Amino acid sequence: MSRVGECGGGGGCGARRGKAAHAGAGAVAGFLGCLLLVWAMGGCGRGCGGGGGEGVRDRVEEVAAQFNLSMSKLQALASLLSSPERECICKSGTINDDNPAHSMPDMSNCRLKNKPSGGNQNRLDNVIIQDCCANEDNYDKNNHENNLLQNAMQQDIGSPTTLWNQNNALSFNHGMIFSLSASLGIVVILVVITIFKRGKQANELCQHEKLLQTPSVKISRKWSKRALLLGVLVGLCSSVWIFSSMHADVVARRIENLENMCDERARMLQDQFNVSMNHVHALAILVSTFHHGKNPSAIDQKTFEDFTARTTFERPLMSGVAYALKVLHSERELFEQKLGWKIKKMETEDQSLVHDYNPEKLQPSPVQDEYAPVIFSQETVKHIISVDMMSGKEDRDNILRSRATGKGALTAPFPLLKSNHLGVVLTFTVYKYDLPPDATPEERIEATLGYLGASFDVPSLVERLLEQLASKQKIVVRLYDITNHTYPTKMYDSDVIASDDLHISNIDFGDPTRKHVMHCRFKHAPSLPWSAIMISSAVAIIVLLVGYIIYATLNSLEEAEDNYTTMRDLKGRAEAADVAKSQFLATVSHEIRTPMNGVLGMLQMLMDTELDTTQRDFVVTAQESGKSLINLINEVLDLAKIESGKIELEAVRFDVRDILDNVVSLFSEKSWAKGIELAVLVSDQVPDVLIGDPWRFRQIITNLVGNSMKFTEQGHIFIRVHLIEEVKRKMEALDDTSPENIEVTANSKNTMPYNTLSGLEVANNRKTLESFRMFKDSSDAIDSVNLLVTVEDTGIGITKDAQTRIFTPFMQADGSTSRTYGGTGIGLSITKRLVELMGGEIGFVSKPGVSSTFSFTAIFKENRKDPGDIKRYCPEPTPPDFQGMRALVVDGRCARAEVTMYHLRRLGIQCDLAATSESALSALLESCNSSVKSSLNMVLVDKEAWGEDSGLAFFRCLIDLRLKGTLKSWQTMPKFFLLAGSITPADSDCLRLAGYSNSIRKPLRLSTVAACLSKALGVGLTGRRSRDNSLVLRSVLTGKNILVVDDNAVNRIVAAGALKKYGAIVTCVDSGKEAISRLQPPHKFDACFMDVQMPEMDGFEATRLVRSVESKINDTIQAGEVSSEIYGNKAHWHVPILAMTADVIQATFEGCMECGMDGYVAKPFEEQQLYSAVAHFLEADATDPLT
């Protein structure tokens, strides 16, 4: 109780010291978790992603600088050069950054190779340009077009900017995961620290108890909660800041994504347009070379048409290509005569939409300085042949700009012929010869031969591009020509209603005089920022949770502080009550046992007088009542000692079989009176001597057997002891029988339906055994002996509702149990506690109205000393005369026969079993006709071998066989013994008439079996030392001077009478002071019995003074200062002092040993206890009266 109080107080005192710091630490931890979340979410995500993007861009710039390429051209090459197309590109020169249109290389072949450089997969591969030849046959047109568009799609996804965004997003996700894990980890660590601190504070009670009264405690409470509130507010503000920061990041990333996607589309459209422009330039070179450079011309309409049809895959974005020849007015008539058609003008000058365009209906071109009639065209625009391109305003301006600058020129958007789409026309000029870069416009106009034009369907171009992009559904694209800022022309539009976000990307189509832009918007409105909401909410929840935990902890600690004073008072009261209870038990036990000692002592002295039968019965009844009261007191004291933890187990050597024989002897009279068969069986595998507490082991078995005897009116009580390992093996071999029941099946003549000791049904305890811990995991100690003890009865059983409280102190099955059967209900509770102290378990199984079986386990140690040492612990050594004898056990009930054979084997007798009369007769006939070595020495027949009095009938059958001449040698017949639980005088006459040598009364014990066999066989008596305690006590105490010290006159009379009964010379004194004066050396006393509790001076103090005097005298004798003759010629004085008290608790016994006493005798005296106490000191001087 004191320890409980200290722990309870410790929680209050220790908590006050670190409570404020604890709350502040919790708030700081929560705030640090929030900051960690923000850092991991923002800084790490952007830092990691941005670092990766910058590294990729640096490597791309290195490659661009190495090959003298601009970033836009390098990206155009990457998008253009798909796997099959990488076989075709030029070798001559580099691409001009200023004007991609004039950087058209020759139609030579080149190839890109990937050169492994290690490191990041996103870095741009090194480009190696190698010479090779162009070969159109190596192309697959369809695959080329598909690869070109697929490469454009991959460029959209895999460009450095996009990769940077993906790395950024991935790093952001990792940061979020890391931050959430870190925050949850902080919460878990905080909770663990809280629990650890609260446990640690319980150990600081004694060091901080004074803090409770200091005023700083209340101040600490107030500031702790204020700090907690501040921490929670900071955490909530942090969650709001996290939300706003993450939401701003989401918006910024959305805008950034829009910018990236819009710029990617604009760049891809520009790159694809530049590629097409290069192909148009190549056609211009083709016309210049093979049409104007050859005479006659190598190209006609058919050739041009076939060539452009077969190379359409090179110009997937163009709707048509045509070549117009420069014709002066002076050359018009000759030209028209040569070609056979008139030069026609365009229908309208403003290039309005023309549906169902028909060249036959066009008018001749009006007279002007020069004309540009179309002479070659692609099949798709074959209807424009003979049309004068100079007759249209947009086309005329386009031609004039192109031939003056030498570069490609674009028209303003206009409706294409035979379509409703807006388009543009790209015009390149074909010159007579190569002009220097610094040629003047006049020189260029003079060298002009014709014009190659290509029309682009802008809506189809944009749609085709967007279809190849995985993210085309995310944004809406519009394309404008803003050359005229006041009235921009919409070249491409979408009908989808887009969001408010807008990004504008510039597009350069190679004509510096025209400006184009792309407007991009998200198709859908932004969704809710769920990541920001969830993370900020999680932070807020974590902050509130941590705050609640700390708040609850503070409240709990405050409650502990408030209850500390009350707990301290209760602790003091509990300690006082505990002391009072112990003192009460000691006092009550002494005050009750002291008069009971007188009562029982006087009754014993009365029994030694001449009494008639009635008077003797009265005295015996009074003795039994007194012993019952003593036993009740012992049980209450045992329970008190167990509950207070003051009981300790001994570790001495003992014989299990001898203890069980003593228990059987104790209950023999009751078993005879009730007609119950009581038996014990110990497995041969159980060691002969064990190390443990024999008294507590005997108490457990005595309680269980006494409980069974109380509730059993017929049948049997069977005690069995086995090793747990042995039972486990049998349980594995036998599935349907009791684990310890190994008997063979009974003969059919046995009328009892069950093969048990009495033939009645018993409860199977297999499930109980399987629940024991030792059956699952036996002890691995080398010298450990694990015993299983089973007490089986055929009593009334235990009801289902009472089975749950059977081991509860002072509880019985029902209210009538105590009135009907007696008892207090604490025996089984004590038994359970003692079994647990022995390291075992106890359980039971019961069938109401049938039987009950109690089983318990216990752990002992095996005695591993010399086997000859075992004899010291066997009170009744077996006579060697029985060794080698043979016995036949005749019993139809095998369980009962096994008990008989167990006791015979203890005597060294070999046993055979005959379960039927036929087998018994056969064994007898064989024995009579056999040699002396194999003959039987004895036959033990159970009185109820095959039914009531069947044992007597069996011997009569033998007499009939002898009269008939079947048994010829009657003189060689073995001795016959009858085993019976009760033998009446009539049965004794029947035995003599039947010819039995003797009868052995059950329950069987080693001593009774040995005595009966010895008397009948005439062995084991010669020279045998008698072990009768009364005779030994007389030999030990005769002539011995004993001093009895007790303040109670009745106790002095009882003690003196008990000692004088055995021949001792007794002197009595009534105080400790008188005892000291009588025991001053030299004195005549051989031993002293001293009461412990006496007025003026108790037995403890008196003993200490006696030992002090003896020690001084012994020191002087050993030092030679005095002669031993002065002290009766004794060189060493030490009188045995034995405590004589009714207080039997452990504390009293320890006090006796500490003060110098030599032994302990509990009141009232009993013969066995008295012998055990004095024999150790006085037996050496005694002589055996029988030797």
UniProtKB/Swiss-Prot annotation:
Residues modified as 4-aspartylphosphate: D942, D1091
Post-translational modification note: Activation probably requires a transfer of a phosphate group between a His in the transmitter domain and an Asp of the receiver domain.
Top-level taxon: Eukaryota
Deletion consequences: Extreme dwarf, low tillering and no heading phenotypes.
InterPro entries the UniProt entry points to: 2C_system_His_kinase (IPR050956), CHASE_dom (IPR006189), CHASE_sf (IPR042240), CheY-like_superfamily (IPR011006), HATPase_C_sf (IPR036890), His_kinase_dom (IPR005467), HisK_dim/P_dom (IPR003661), HisK_dim/P_sf (IPR036097)
Start and end residues of each Histidine kinase domain: 587-862
SUPFAM superfamilies recorded: ATPase domain of HSP90 chaperone/DNA topoisomerase II/histidine kinase, CheY-like, Homodimeric domain of signal transducing histidine kinase
Keyword list, A-Z: Cell membrane, Cytokinin signaling pathway, Kinase, Membrane, Phosphoprotein, Repeat, Transferase, Transmembrane, Transmembrane helix, Two-component regulatory system
Enzyme class: transferase
Domain Response regulatory: 886-1017, 1041-1178
Catalytic activity: ATP + protein L-histidine = ADP + protein N-phospho-L-histidine
Cystine pairs: none
GO cellular component, one term: plasma membrane
Record EC number: 2.7.13.3
GO biological process terms, semicolon-separated: cytokinin-activated signaling pathway
UniProt name for this protein: Probable histidine kinase 5
Organism: Oryza sativa subsp. japonica (Rice)
